[in-house]
Each structure stands twice: as structure tokens, then as C-alpha cells.
Design a protein with these regions (language model features):
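N-terminal-proximal low-complexity accessory segments that begin disordered
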Residues: 2-120, 127
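Long, contiguous, structured domain-core segments that constitute the functional module of a protein
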Residues: 263-428, 437, 480, 484-489
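Extended, regular secondary-structure scaffolds
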Residues: 146-334
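Generic, well-ordered alpha-helical scaffold segments in large soluble proteins
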Residues: 45, 73, 77, 93-100, ...
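Short, hydrophobic/π-rich interface segment
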Residues: 424-449
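C-terminal edge-of-domain segments
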Residues: 457-503
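Long, charge-patterned amphipathic interaction tracts in eukaryotic proteins
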Residues: 92-165
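Long, charged, glycine-rich C-terminal linkers/tails
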Residues: 90-94, 108-119, 441-463
């Protein structure tokens, strides 16, 4: 009816006043809403919203006007619900989980488990535990899986949380202490933990100002970050990773006008900032990259950068990028990230252990160019040793080394009682590692997936104080290089004929 051009012309020439919601008495509105009889409710609505003179209005046009007025009122209420801060956080979490599930190509080798626990409960778990190995998180990821025969070790933990260096308004939790406990549990289970940095970590109220020129080096060198730097210097912080900024989880709802039935709802996202858009945790974007890489090659090294003519590496392709409404061809799209991260800012954030999601200019994609862990790489006298320490602290190296360590633990656990000496155990593990090792440098991606190691050696020693207990030292060199440098990863774990209690 509203599409009738003749009718619209008549209405524009003879506009009729209608009562807004502010002009209707509140008692009459409650009476209308509480009425159970549809006919009586319609009669009351007509009485409340009818103009003073309806003789010049045709019934169909008047009804169309009332339907549009009702749509406007309902749209305002839906906007209020959708843009509520708590509702946005809930919707973003579920949509982030959906993106992870949608990224799974082969359900047989990729499993996703959901643990519904708040950051407050996780912090309380770490505070009440006498030590990290007595916490509930350690029991879930280590005792029930990694440390139990038949259990399936976790490869990575994605936490939909935002952390900072100290408590702030509406967040009275010591994140540093909680992260320290999580890092120790994650290191024991060889399972990195990934969450996001809160804007308060940079002294900001939101990520909108992150795109402005800020001195990252000056921020993290201040006295307020002493505990934060101390946590990053610990070896177990290699199993922590922080992503930023936020990523768009859903395009604004828009009426496609293909049907005249139902509500004509267009979500209103206009404002002085972008808070009405649905932003979510960037750890979900990194999770889709990890799932895609593991589904393709069963390995985690190609999770950064953009390879030529290939949807792989650190390229993020699943998340929405709404087009500008003035562009009917959708050739020009908005960013999928909440703020632009420049090359210089990305390098500065990477130096301080942050994994930045960068929008690819004039495309519908984003990319992780670097994947550092939170650890501060150690500095040695030799430049080669310092470079090796920097590369070994990167998340892709930790993920690859952790995968090998988990396999070694499971293999030895299944061979309990079959080894008479440490040498026989060492020989068995070395033969197993040699199956995935080759010294060739001219390998294709497919061959590197089959032989991911350039060099591997293992040393197994028996603990003289504890018969039946073995400790292993594994040295790994992968084929995947970073900035033309090849790193060596060193893993230490204890092997027991009874159980593994320390890493």
C-alpha cells in the first residue's frame, strides 16, 4: 500500500497528524497492552491514535500510516535491546562460537568444546587453589585429558575475555595473577591460551583511540606495568597470546523489502562512534585461522601473513564487511575491524606480545601479519641466538612444538612397561620423529605438511632417585622460517611409567 505512488502523493498533499508515543497517556498505553481481546485492543488503538478529523482519510491509507507508526515503535524497542551492552556481549560470544564451528572442514580431526565460565570465576579458581596444579582449570585440561590414558589433549584454549594490567571500572579482577596461573596450567598441558587485550591495557576507554598516534613503548615502560613485565619475562608466558582489536560479528539488520509481510526493521547504527555495531573478540578470528590451517595440513606454522594466490596463512575471510549504503555494487566495503591498525602500530604491538588483526585495504578481508606470544624474548650475546629466541617465542612455533610434545607423551604412555632402559625409549622416540624429518630445502607446501621437521633429536634420561621415571629433552627445527631465519625449539618434559606430574 505504501508503494502506491498515487496514494503517497495524496498523503503528502494532505498530511494528517498522528499522536506520538509521548502524547498518549501512559495509563491508556498499559490498558492497550494488557488487553487480551484482539478486537477490543484494535478499537482502543484506533481511539488513541486517530487524528481529530478522519473524514478526508481513506481507511487503507490511514491503516498503512498506523502500521508504519507501530513498526517505528517496535524498531526503537528492538534497537534498545540489540544495542544493550550485556546483550551485545552475549550475542558476540555465540556468533564467535558459530564462526569457529563453521570453519570446521573435517569434524573427525577437529573438535570444539565449550566451557561456560566467567572470567571472575576463573580468577577465583586461581586465587583459591594452593598451587596451579590444584586448580579446576588444570584438572579439566590436564588431569581429565592430557594426563589420563585415553584422553584427548587440547591444542589451544580460546578465551572470550579482555584483560588489562590492573583492575579498572566494572572490572575489579587482578588479571596479571590470573594469567600467571593460566600460563602455568597451559604450559603443563602444552596448550596455549589465547584471549584479548582490553583497551584499558593502553590506558584507553575504547579501541577507537587506538588508531591515533600513541607511544606504545612509553606506555609499557611506565611504573604501572612492573607486574605485567615480570609476567612476560617468565618462560610459561610463551603459552599466552593476546589479540586485538575487535572484529565485526554481524552486519546491521536491514529490510530487504522483498516481502510486504512482517516488520520492516532497519537497525539504526548511526552515531558519533561505532558502539552500535556488534563487535566481538578477535581471538575467534585467530581460531578460524588455526582451524583452517590444521584442516588443510595438520600443522600450525602457516598462520601469519598473506600467501600469494592462496586463501591461507593469517588471512581472515569469514567475518562480515558491510558495504557503504551509497555504493550499490558493494565494491567499497567497511572494515571488519573496529579500528585501523597501521604497519608501524602493528610492529610496535608485536614487539610487546600483541597479535594485531589488520584490515586489508579496500578488500573484505583482514590478516594476522605476526603471531607473537606474550613472552619477552631473551637477549643473548650472539645475534643468531637472540633471533632464535625471538622466533621460538612465536605462537606458531609454540603450537607446533606443543603438538609434538603431546604426541610423545601419549606414545610413551601407551608403551608403559615395554621399556627396560632409557636408551630403548630414546631410540623408539627418535625413530618416530625421523618419520617426519627431512633435510631438503626445496619442499612444496604439501611436502612440508608431510615432513614438517628439518631436524629433530631427542634425549631420554632416567631419574636415579625415582626408578621408572624418565625425563626427555627434544630439539626441533621446522621447515617454516620467519623473516628468512630458522629457529630451534627446545622442549623438556618428564616421562613416567606411572603418570606425568611435572613439565
Amino acid at each position: 500500500m505504501l508503494n502506491d505512488s498515487a496514494g503517497m502523493a495524496v498523503m503528502s498533499e494532505n498530511p494528517s497528524p498522528t499522536l506520538s508515543s509521548d502524547e498518549i497517556p501512559l495509563a491508556d498505553i498499559y490498558s492497550f497492552l494488557s488487553e487480551n481481546d484482539d478486537v477490543e485492543a484494535f478499537r482502543r488503538w484506533v481511539e488513541l491514535s486517530s487524528p481529530a478529523d478522519t473524514s478526508r482519510l481513506e481507511p487503507c491509507r490511514w491503516l498503512a500510516q498506523q502500521v508504519a507508526f507501530i513498526d517505528e515503535l517496535i524498531s526503537e524497542q528492538i534497537d534498545a535491546v540489540l544495542h544493550n551492552k550485556r546483550f551485545q556481549a552475549l550475542e558476540a560470544s555465540w556468533r564467535g562460537l558459530w564462526f569457529l564451528i563453521d570453519a570446521v572442514v573435517n569434524p573427525e580431526n577437529t573438535k570444539i568444546r565449550l566451557l561456560d565460565v566467567s572470567w571472575k570465576d576463573l580468577a577465583r579458581d586461581m586465587e583459591r587453589a594452593p598451587d596451579f596444579d590444584q586448580s579446576g582449570l588444570f584438572h579439566l585440561i590436564y588431569n581429565e585429558e592430557f594426563g589420563t590414558p585415553g584422553g584427548e589433549p587440547f591444542s589451544v584454549l580460546l578465551g572470550d575475555y579482555y584483560v588489562a594490567h590492573r583492575p579498572y571500572e566494572d572490572h575489579r579482577i587482578d588479571d596479571v595473577f590470573t594469567l600467571q596461573g593460566i600460563s602455568r596450567a597451559a604450559a603443563a598441558a602444552f596448550c596455549p591460551f589465547v584471549c584479548s587485550a582490553a583497551p584499558q591495557l593502553f590506558g584507553l576507554d575504547d579501541f577507537d583511540n587506538l588508531g591515533l598516534h600513541i607511544n606504545v613503548d612509553e606506555i609499557f615502560r611506565s611504573h604501572d606495568y612492573v607486574r605485567w613485565r615480570s609476567m612476560r619475562e617468565h618462560d610459561d608466558s610463551r603459552f599466552l597470546a593476546l589479540t586485538l582489536p575487535q572484529v565485526l560479528m554481524r552486519e546491521p539488520y536491514q529490510d530487504n523489502r522483498r516481502s510486504r509481510r512482517g516488520l520492516r526493521f532497519n537497525e539504526s547504527v548511526a552515531g558519533k562512534d561505532n558502539r552500535k555495531y556488534l563487535w566481538g573478540n578477535a581471538c575467534f578470528a585467530l581460531g578460524t585461522v588455526l582451524i583452517r590451517e590444521f584442516s588443510e595440513v595438520g600443522w600450525f606454522s602457516h598462520i601469519r601473513g598473506v600467501p600469494r594466490d592462496h586463501y591461507g596463512g593469517g588471512l581472515v575471510t569469514q567475518f562480515p564487511t558491510p558495504a557503504y549504503r551509497t555504493d550499490s555494487s558493494r565494491a567499497t566495503v567497511k572494515m571488519s575491524t573496529s579500528v585501523t591498525v597501521t604497519d608501524q602500530l602493528e610492529r610496535e604491538l608485536s614487539d610487546y606480545g600483541m597479535i594485531a588483526l589488520c584490515h586489508c585495504f579496500q578488500t573484505q578481508y583482514a590478516v594476522f601479519n605476526n603471531c607473537p606470544s606474550l613472552q619477552i624474548p631473551k637477549v643473548y650475546a650472539k645475534k643468531s641466538a637472540t633471533a632464535n629466541a625471538r622466533i621460538s617465542s612465536m605462537l606458531q612455533q609454540i603450537l607446533c612444538g606443543s603438538r609434538v610434545a603431546q604426541y610423545i607423551k601419549v606414545i610413551v604412555r601407551d608403551k608403559v612397561g615395554s621399556y627396560t632402559t632409557a636408551e630403548s625409549c630414546e631410540r623408539f622416540l627418535q625413530n618416530w620423529l625421523d618419520q617426519y624429518t627431512t633435510g631438503r630445502d626445496d619442499l612444496s607446501w604439501e611436502m612440508m605438511a608431510r615432513y614438517p621437521l628439518r631436524e629433530a633429536r631427542v634425549v631420554v634420561d632416567e631419574d636415579p632417585a625415582q626408578p621408572g621415571y624418565y625425563s626427555s629433552l627434544v630439539h626441533l627445527k621446522t621447515h617454516y622460517s620467519v623473516d628468512h631465519l630458522v629457529s630451534e625449539l627446545r622442549l623438556t618434559t618428564s616421562l613416567s611409567q606411572i603418570d606425568i606430574g611435572k613439565v
